[in-house]
Amino acid sequence: MFDPETLRTFIAVAETGSFSKAAERLCKTTATISYRIKLLEENTGVALFFRTTRSVTLTAAGEHLLCQARDWLSWLESMPSELQQVNDGVERQVNIVINNLLYNPQAVARLLAWLNERYPFTQFHISRQIYMGVWDSLLYEGFSLAIGVTGTEALANTFSLDPLGSVQWRFVMAADHPLANVEEPLTEAQLRRFPAVNIEDSARTLTKRVAWRLPGQKEIIVPDMETKIAAHLAGVGIGFLPKSLCQSMLDNQQLVSRVIPTMRPPSPLSLAWRKFGSGKAVEDIVTLFTQRRPEISGFLEIFGNPRS
């Protein structure tokens, strides 16, 4: 009933409002077009067009069919290529989770453009998670690949890892903060007087990692790195920032870096993917990272020197 030729004919008549104009568009005779529409109406059991001597217009049923017909025709026309892609080992859907520390909208867009050009029938889903929330997505939510899991060892032997680099940290505050010019190292008693600005771990199943905060110290939780940086600049509170993200603000004296009793060690991050069952799209993403291709360079800017 709804074969490609019938759908093309119906859409052409609906869009031109004329059997003769539809015939011209499809290089068919008017009689052929009229017969196909008549047969379609007989098979569906409803009138799809109001006919006058000058034009044809859609009935309510015809309007409904037109909304569906375009999608059906597009699906039918793309199906051979989709089936070939599946036969070639290409995934129907790839879910990618990215660590908040590495998340870069321009880098994400560049990667998606590269992938979409090569795998036009694959659905890509991007998620942004924090700390152990990245591993959580891989282990419990069916994600295919993670850009920036914490550590250099897999939490399960079903995953492969490629170390990307280590994030270096600086303890910062606004340049006009009361502690900005106090003798170093700052004491816990001095630090405890001011709020710690943190981003909460997004893990749902795994144990959340606790960010820097002293016992009894007020904590302000913000949703992302952009807000955390803005809060430090506004003098709202104190805390650690990745060196590469705050260096320009340290250089122009918007922020100052101070030494505290317990400095945060570097945080190693890795690419992680499933050892078994990965398709060609995931394999290509892994290759981009292991070969440090330009297409993924935006994700590695935070490290300064990748693999460090």
Swiss-Prot record:
Residues 2-59 form the HTH lysR-type domain. InterPro entries: LTTR, LysR_subst-bd, Tscrpt_reg_HTH_LysR, WH-like_DNA-bd_sf, WH_DNA-bd_sf. PROSITE patterns: HTH_LYSR. It comes from the Bacteria. Keywords: Activator, DNA-binding, Transcription, Transcription regulation. GO terms for molecular function: DNA binding; DNA-binding transcription factor activity. The keyword Metal-binding does not apply. Residues 19-38 bind DNA. PANTHER family: HTH-TYPE TRANSCRIPTIONAL ACTIVATOR ALLS, TRANSCRIPTIONAL REGULATOR. Positive regulator essential for the expression of allD operon. Binds to the allD promoter. Belongs to the LysR transcriptional regulatory family. NCBIfam families: PRK10094.1. This is HTH-type transcriptional activator AllS. It comes from Escherichia coli O6:H1 (strain CFT073 / ATCC 700928 / UPEC).
